[in-house]
Amino acid sequence: MASSMCGMFPGQQPPGSLPPPGPGGPGQPGLLTGTPGNRGANNTLVDELEASFEACFASLVSQDYVNGTDQEEIRTGVDQCIQKFLDVARQTECFFLQKRLQLSVQKPEQVEKEDASELKNELQRKEMLIQKHLAKIHHWQQVLEDINVQHKKPTELPQGPLAFLEQASANLPAPMKPN
């Protein structure tokens, strides 16, 4: 697998070696090799992605646009930079999808292990989320219990000679105000 990624990142290609053939076989360009008119001899897909990303920002902060260039011209330039970035991003995604497909054909057990690992991680994440919610529920149940205890305390006061009158007057409606 590591040898099939050779050339994807700068400095990985052994000196004097030819780039690996593209996914279509010998004679067809791969996603990492230089295609005529598209990439320089030493540029990889990652280099091109980085360059197009930098070009997007450069077009947004360019002094040419600040010095009174037409708004439509600015929009066109930015759109072209963004479109190039998106195209290279799609090519990069395609490269990794092809590598994933090759891996699934060559080593299906590896893909199953990765899927099982992802499912275990998902279960752990959800279990932690459940524990977090249970802790919140416990906290709020405790708050409600404390409130209920506080409301019960006034009725548990020792009964004095005027306690009956105090309870009865608490249940009476408030007097009406004259209009």
UniProtKB/Swiss-Prot annotation:
Residues 1-43 are annotated as: Disordered. Transmembrane segments: none annotated. Its main location: nucleus. It is found in: Nucleus. It comes from the Eukaryota. One of its GO terms (cellular component) is mediator complex. Residues 109-139 form a coiled coil. Keywords: Activator, Coiled coil, Nucleus, Transcription, Transcription regulation. Residues 12-26 have a biased composition (Pro residues). Component of the Mediator complex, a coactivator involved in the regulated transcription of nearly all RNA polymerase II-dependent genes. Mediator functions as a bridge to convey information from gene-specific regulatory proteins to the basal RNA polymerase II transcription machinery. Mediator is recruited to promoters by direct interactions with regulatory proteins and serves as a scaffold for the assembly of a functional preinitiation complex with RNA polymerase II and the general transcription factors. PANTHER family: MEDIATOR COMPLEX SUBUNIT 28, MEDIATOR OF RNA POLYMERASE II TRANSCRIPTION SUBUNIT 28. Component of the Mediator complex. Belongs to the Mediator complex subunit 28 family. This is Mediator of RNA polymerase II transcription subunit 28. The gene is med28.
